Amino acid sequence: MAASAALILPESPSMKKAVPLINAIDTGRFPRLLSRILQKLHLKAESSFSEEEEEKLQAAFSLEKQELHLVLETISFVLEQAVYHNVKPAALQQQLEMIHLRKDKAEAFASAWSAMGQETVEKFRQRILGPHKLETVGWQLNLQMAHSAQAKLQSPQAVLQLGVSKEDAKNVEKVLVEFNHKELFDFYNKLETIQAQLDSLT
């Protein structure tokens, strides 16, 4: 029950905007929408719906394109939080009602999560553990001279060399990633965020 209690959905401006839009969706169609999003939730690079399907959803739910995207993103966010906290269906329903989602919609979330939650969590585990493993990290600095004769500034680039292996192979594949100063700083900040989230879960 500790994991369930840890799930807290923030009442952010986008969440407050999305809740009435979700509440207005036809209750009969809502479970199918949830089911489709849950099926593809673990495929981060892939959208749950094609452009043509999104147009049909806009018409069916009487939503503008931007409103539909907000609804889909919010539903995905809620379900991702349920995955990361491995929350119980009843706790998910309770949290959704606390952010003013109508009871029928909160129940639909809980019902979909009860039916597909564990399967979705397992898909996420497989994606996270994945077939690739980081074996080595190397780095070097490259200095590139500016092409302009007037500007003799050097543009330093950091090159990370990542050695990754697959579980079923002995060879280590080398992946080179190049960063300028800003890109490296942004990457560092992302690592800090990831580290903070890991620390909060351990």
Curated annotation (Swiss-Prot):
N-acetylalanine: residues carrying this PTM: A2
Location(s), subcellular: Cytoplasm; Nucleus
Keywords from the named record: Acetylation, Cytoplasm, Nucleus, Phosphoprotein, Transcription, Transcription regulation, Ubl conjugation pathway
GO cellular component labels: cytoplasm; nucleoplasm
Domain COMM: 133-202
Residue numbers bearing the Phosphoserine modification: S155
Record-stated family: Belongs to the COMM domain-containing protein 10 family.
Subunit structure: Component of the commander complex consisting of the CCC subcomplex and the retriever subcomplex. Component of the CCC (COMMD/CCDC22/CCDC93) subcomplex consisting of COMMD1, COMMD2, COMMD3, COMMD4, COMMD5, COMMD6, COMMD7, COMMD8, COMMD9, COMMD10, CCDC22 and CCDC93; within the complex forms a heterodimer with COMMD5. Interacts with RELA, RELB, NFKB1/p105, NFKB2/p100. Interacts with CCDC22, CCDC93, SCNN1B, CUL1, CUL2, CUL3, CUL4A, CUL4B, CUL7.
Function: Scaffold protein in the commander complex that is essential for endosomal recycling of transmembrane cargos; the commander complex is composed of the CCC subcomplex and the retriever subcomplex. May modulate activity of cullin-RING E3 ubiquitin ligase (CRL) complexes. May down-regulate activation of NF-kappa-B.
Listed name of the protein: COMM domain-containing protein 10
